[in-house]
Amino acid sequence: MKKNIKNSIFAGECMVEVSGNTDNLYKNQIKMNLNFGGDTFNAAVYFSRLTNKLFNTFYFTGLGKDHLSEMMIERFKYENLKTDLIQRIKGKYPGLYSIQTDKKGNRSFSYWRNESAAKEMMKKCNLDNLEKFISNTELFYYTGISLGILKPKDQNKLIELSKKSKLTAFDFNYRNSFHGNKIKSQSL
């Protein structure tokens, strides 16, 4: 790392995004687009682009040891995101979502994240080393979705880790269908 450059950490889940026009579903082939997305990933990319000369932008998540996870890491590097904090978890994979757009242009989403490696990111990391690293970090960013994918014990660990940074940014990003219990979510 370069001297005098500050560190930032974005914690959450980057997912595989599948989108495209399914109007031709009954033909032999339909063309779909493959990309990567997610609230913390998108925020990290734009933060990195805006502050590239001033900040190292680290992405903290869990990924598998599969081809799509490798592609995702290459994309992180292309976007100048540091991959040192990525936890590699055998037998787990990136979450996936698809975007469907109806004839009026309204979008709807479907999610597959039961086997998401990001749900395990707190279990595989060395918390002592991560805590020391975060204490020298200018910004720690995470969202309600970052918490929502984790088990309660891991949610509390992430919240406690975030407090070690000089500045913590939290976007609640509440989704009723995802979080369910509003009172429990507000307590976090």
PLM regions: where:
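Residue-level signal for short, function-critical loop segments
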Residues: 14, 63-65, 145-146
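Substrate-binding N-lobe of the ribokinase-like
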Residues: 27-96, 101-106, 115-120
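Acidic active-site catalytic centers that drive phospho-/nucleotidyl reactions
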Residues: 13, 17, 42, 171
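Short amphipathic alpha-helical segments
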Residues: 22-24, 73, 153-154
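Ribokinase/PfkB-type carbohydrate-kinase core domain
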Residues: 2-11, 77, 83, 102-188
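Positively charged, low-complexity intrinsically disordered leader regions
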Residues: 1-25
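Short, glycine/acidic-enriched loop or turn micro-motifs at the edges of active sites
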Residues: 16, 20, 65, 174
